[in-house]
């Protein structure tokens, strides 16, 4: 479970931006809250609003880039290969480091992991945990100067195998380091998502191929969404699957006749929901942190709402899955769906071009306040200015 993520000097984010999933004292929708231990409560969903080009997607991009650097395509760079730094561009100052930090729970233990980097090397890296409720260092790194608390000699050997453009959390786990294993596994197993309009079909296809209960869950959701699809089959090769959906028509003699339609001929919204629901069910099964940019893309608002309701329902979300998403859908600004501490905003300063991230709770909205109307009227900022005036709605 993710408690907090912070990012500094990434794309439109110059100064440190923080999103927190720690639950406030809000007494509404308390049944949706999840608990990593007996003392803390977290929210399962965080929604991030903002105008186009405000920088809201850059927060999610940073979180997923952190994963890519730990265990994805940037985890095994060759010597001399450049790191994927995208620093804030609107400044005359020399390029500053970019930094990420995630505070999370895995196996009942709290961890804080972060690092800073430029285009050529990792500048700092650190990992702390709270095994008995007290903070303890696992390792820290400043350039190639390391500090360890356990298995010191062995870890110094692993540090010597860590190139300046690679993370120690990554290389130490290639050598099965027990001190960093669990912190690494959270990133590898629990952090997932996608940006923009990307359609990720791997989870849905895996469920269909497995058949049985896994396929039934996908079909149940497709039927629930009223998309007219009765079955889904996969032919072709694993590398080039051919996905078809079964539709039925009632004939004059009272029987039904089935027709298989290639998924590519379905509406974009249907294709999008199929890709989404596969990832949703996989995340709900594994208790992941699911990061989704533009959650409503091409889908009917009721389908988007249903996906969020699944995460908010404690009877469905039994493994403490979390969802972090960006959206423009003001219909989701509904206090019967989301708590006030689950709604966040991104706003860009037109003078400095910097993105500011802040929570709805900073405005202390009333319990029955119409959040959607207030947002469109500019009460919380983070909206476009059309012709020099704030967009608004009666």
Predicted feature descriptions by range:
Residues 45-49, 237-281, 289-302:
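Conserved ABC ATPase signature
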Residues 1-4, 247, 305-394:
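C-terminal lobe/lid and adjacent interdomain/linker elements of RecA-like ASCE P-loop ATPase modules
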Residues 112-238:
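Electropositive, glycine-dotted interaction segments
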Residues 34-41, 45-47, 51, 60-113, ...:
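Conserved P-loop NTP-binding catalytic core
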Residues 40-41, 93-95, 105-108, 281-284, ...:
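Conserved catalytic network of the ASCE P-loop NTPase/AAA+ motor domain
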Residues 8, 199-265, 385-394:
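Extended helical coiled-coil dimerization/tether regions that scaffold
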Residues 2-65:
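Pre-Walker A-like glycine/lysine-rich segment at the N-terminus of P-loop NTPase domains
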Residues 91-146, 359-368, 374:
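P-loop NTPase motor core
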